[in-house]
Amino acid sequence: MNVLVINCGSSSLKYQLINSDSEEVLAKGLCERIGIDGRLVYQKEGLDKEITEAPMPTHKEAIQMVLDALVNPKTGAVKSLAEIDAVGHRVVHGGEKFSDSVVITEEVIAQVEECNDLAPLHNPANIIGIRACQALMPNVPMVGVFDTAFHQTMPEKAYLYGLPYEYYEKYKVRRYGFHGTSHSFVSKEAASYLGMDLNNSKIIVAHLGNGASVSAVLNGKCVDTSMGLTPLEGLVMGTRSGDIDPSIMEFIAKKENLDIDGVMNVLNKKSGVAGMSGVSSDFRDLEAAYNEGNERAIAAVEVFSYRVAKYIGAYAAAMNGVDAIAFTAGIGENTSFVREKIMAYLGYLGIKIDRVTNDKTRGVEALISTADSSVKVCVIPTNEELAICRETVKLVG
């Protein structure tokens, strides 16, 4: 069957049309500047990208343009919309309500809306995308796949904060975690690639991109993850601070005369390796600056790598051991010198890295540890769109 995968942001929309039988991407692209002037990028498999500038007042017009491109007589991937069998939607926050993917109903949409406070930038946009698809494809089944769902297997000791319990009872303040679709996909792929039994394994997944998180996956189930109530907790990221002393917020607010929104803007958008280095949130730029001897870039890379290694060590303790570590996402898949820095801290686990293989591995599945390493270390490219496609087929196929 053909599954249209939609990832809807506040002013953008990414899409892929995937044949679930062959798992081939038939077409992909994105809509940008929705609500402003509008720009559609469309690419059929095997052809060059096409870019169309056109007004997109709302997501409905954006999705209509995507559908028109998919059935275009010359460059379309399908002859008619009847060949699109299902739509899989990325939904960022499912709170405690959703521990798995679901077929979208009015009740599901209402429950997602109840989680809007937990993801005010993302959930409303996700719902807008769902509504737009329903209006344009009323008879096509829709599935919601949640970033938070995979982490719902965490035990209470991992998700509760040391705050008054009433905040959990009243407001559901707890660790939720994100990138769950990626962590789930990569842990399964890693077990398969390494010939392990997923249901009898201890795998740590390091999803290292502009947003970054680590998860502990015990016997196929997440038991801990580094992001929290929001994606701000945990690792140092591209522009996010990660873990800090909460009192820093009050200290900076007084010194810089900022309100709470101003402080949160600093922590979310002006911190991380970009804020530390003054160079960029992009590790390609950071690596170049690092190699040129830029002291702030060196410090940013060292702090980033050290924090990842600390979390991996913590999760090895949480699971009382580790069988495999899987690196994924933009930095995890492509930045070999950062992988090597992280692994250098973990020799006590018996990890030995094959430097030659590590250095040449970019964006492909690879075993980067040596044959005598106690823990297998690998690179597994993430594919959240394919994961959403598989989840959709599982429910409506």
Swiss-Prot record:
The keyword Cell membrane does not apply. The keyword Cytoplasm applies. Mg(2+). Can also accept Mn(2+). Its main location: cytoplasm. The active site is at D147 (proton donor/acceptor). Pathway: Metabolic intermediate biosynthesis; acetyl-CoA biosynthesis; acetyl-CoA from acetate: step 1/2. Coiled coil: none annotated. The record marks H179, R240 as: Transition state stabilizer. One of its GO terms (biological process) is acetyl-CoA biosynthetic process. Signal peptide: none annotated. Its EC number is 2.7.2.1. Mg(2+) binds at N7, E384. Keywords: ATP-binding, Cytoplasm, Kinase, Magnesium, Metal-binding, Nucleotide-binding, Transferase. Substrate binds at R90. Gene3D superfamilies: 3.30.420.40. It is found in: Cytoplasm. It catalyses: acetate + ATP = acetyl phosphate + ADP. ATP binds at K14, H207, L208, G209, N210, G211, D282, F283, R284, G330, I331, G332, E333, N334. Belongs to the acetokinase family. This is Acetate kinase. It comes from Agathobacter rectalis (strain ATCC 33656 / DSM 3377 / JCM 17463 / KCTC 5835 / VPI 0990).
